[in-house]
Design a protein with these regions (language model features):
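Short hydrophobic helices that act as membrane-entry/anchoring signals
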Residues: 66-70, 74-77
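Core of folded catalytic or high-affinity ligand/protein-binding domains
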Residues: 57, 61, 76-268
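N-terminal mitochondrial targeting presequence
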Residues: 1-62
Length: 280
């Protein structure tokens, strides 16, 4: 178990403390020491490690204890620096064991969501025709999505692939959530500054139930000024919560087939209320 924990943490970029040479159970053995000193138990651990199969490309099998350690470490780092997208991604995967199956079930019971699960579309530069989207009319989803990317200097290729979700279908669900995150900014009319990110996290927390979104919504405001906190509390959070409750599941929209649809029309279809007239 210790060997498995060290390997998963190392691959995830999370450092672990190593016990000293005088610790019980030979816990201080380094990876460079002869394997013979590990005895029969070490061979069994190695066999156990080899028995953890990858469920999809990039998958890192982890135990519940490893997930707990990764969740704790990534939560601390994500709260310290909310723009550490790698830590936010690890936190989402290691704490979404209840929310992700619920989201998958919603997709399976919706015609458009079910088709998305079957076809597995991806939103990245290799699948997007950016030139065509730029030529769409102002106000259309495709044109406003590209405008959001360019105005905020972000790329759809920055979304990290899933690693720690121990189910291939659920791994796609969280990948899809990540790739439509910028679509949520577009539909909600929110920029990528801290205030805009907090508002989107409130909406997503209500929509998805992902603990990572809840933590971002709850602790993100600590970095805001008093004026922005007032706007957030009186205008933006109530609107985000009402919209999140009223809206249908955001993962049940095949956005790639809605590029020509006006943003206002799609908001109305999903159930998102018009954004408040405040400066974000």
């Amino acid at each position: 178990m210790l060997l498995l924990l060290r390997r998963a943490a190392a691959r995830a970029g999370v450092p672990l403390l190593r016990a000293g040479p005088g610790s019980p159970g030979n816990a201080g053995l380094s990876r460079s020491e002869p394997r013979a000193r590990r005895g029969r138990g070490g061979e069994e651990e190695e066999e156990e490690d080899e028995g953890c199969y990858q469920l999809y490309p990039g998958h890192i099998p982890t135990s519940p204890l490893q997930k707990a350690l990764l969740a704790a470490g990534s939560a601390v780092m994500a709260l310290y620096d909310p723009y550490r997208h790698d830590m936010v991604a690890v936190l989402g995967e290691t704490t979404g064991c209840l929310a992700l199956p619920n989201l998958r079930d919603k997709m399976k019971h919706h015609p458009e969501g079910y088709r998305i699960l079957q076809e597995r579309p991806r939103i990245c530069l290799s699948t997007l025709d950016m030139s065509r989207l730029r030529e769409l009319p102002d106000g259309s989803l495709g044109r406003e999505y590209v405008r959001f990317l360019e105005d905020n200097k972000v790329s759809p290729d920055t979304r990290m692939p899933a690693k720690f979700v121990d189910d291939e279908e659920l791994a796609y669900v969280i990948q899809r959530y990540r790739e439509v995150h910028d679509m949520m900014h577009t539909l909600l009319g929110m920029p990528t500054n801290m205030l805009g990110e907090v508002v989107v996290k409130w909406f997503e927390a209500v929509q998805t139930g992902l603990p990572m979104c809840v933590l971002g919504a709850a602790f993100g405001p600590v970095r805001l000024s008093a004026r922005k906190l007032q706007v957030l509390a009186t205008e933006l959070v109530p609107w985000a919560i009402r919209s999140g409750r009223n809206a249908s599941c955001i993962l049940n929209v095949y956005y790639e087939q809605r590029w020509e649809q006006p943003v206002e029309s799609l908001r109305e279809e999903i159930g998102i209320f018009p954004p408040p007239a405040v400066c974000v």
